[in-house]
Amino acid sequence: MTRYKATISYDGYAFAGFQRQPHARSVQEEIEKTLTRLNKGQTITVHGAGRTDSGVHALGQVIHFDLPYQMDEEKLRFALDTQSPEDIDVISIELVAADFHCRYAKHSKTYEFIVDRGRPKNPMRRHYATHFPYPLDVERMQIAIKKLEGTHDFTGFTASGTSVEDKVRTITEASLIVDETGQFLTFTFSGNGFLYKQIRNMVGTLLKIGNNRMPVEQIDLILEKKDRQLAGPTAAPNGLYLKEIRYEE
């Protein structure tokens, strides 16, 4: 068997998430169906580096799969790209070692979260930016977001029901910028891994801080007490993008 690593992007609006699930459309299943057709009906299993939720987008998701033959990478990329649904793009494909696993190989991820604070909102971006039409103090949020950098126990920002026991993660970059129109905010988070709904919970908390409904020091309190009830609401999924996954050499 020959193992391939692919970088893909997708519009998450019409998907129930990346991971295959019964009675719902998923990115994994759509790519597997296309690869199975290319493999003359023989089933191909796709593995993903990240499991994005329903409505979450990806600019640089990474997958891997095995084929029983070797094929030119660009020809394979073109075939998979053109025969996959319109809301999935295959950016690149490369041959990798047989023991490479996109999820378990050491890597870091970068996510972006886009907020539309326009009044009214931009209707063309309604599936691609989370609307928050309330006053926001950007400087307060920029101070607060820096408190998330470093190695912390992020239990207070994790959704209930997660089976992960070790909730210590390292965030190497946490930043917030505003576009030139002042309407769109982009939150960026890079790190060695993120917990279930962690980014959406962090953004929901930062928006509350920006709206003066929580103090800037609330971030310190949440990290110290490890209490989800102290954090803000979970931000909607439509503003979240898996931007990039970087593997160590």
Swiss-Prot record:
SUPFAM superfamilies: Pseudouridine synthase. It catalyses: uridine(38/39/40) in tRNA = pseudouridine(38/39/40) in tRNA. GO terms for biological process: tRNA pseudouridine synthesis. Keywords: Isomerase, tRNA processing. GO terms for molecular function: RNA binding; tRNA pseudouridine(38-40) synthase activity. It comes from the Bacteria. Coiled coil: none annotated. InterPro entries: PsdUridine_synth_cat_dom_sf (IPR020103), PsdUridine_synth_TruA (IPR001406), PsdUridine_synth_TruA_a/b_dom (IPR020097), PsdUridine_synth_TruA_C (IPR020095), TruA/RsuA/RluB/E/F_N (IPR020094). Belongs to the tRNA pseudouridine synthase TruA family. Formation of pseudouridine at positions 38, 39 and 40 in the anticodon stem and loop of transfer RNAs. Homodimer. This is tRNA pseudouridine synthase A. It comes from Streptococcus pneumoniae (strain Taiwan19F-14).
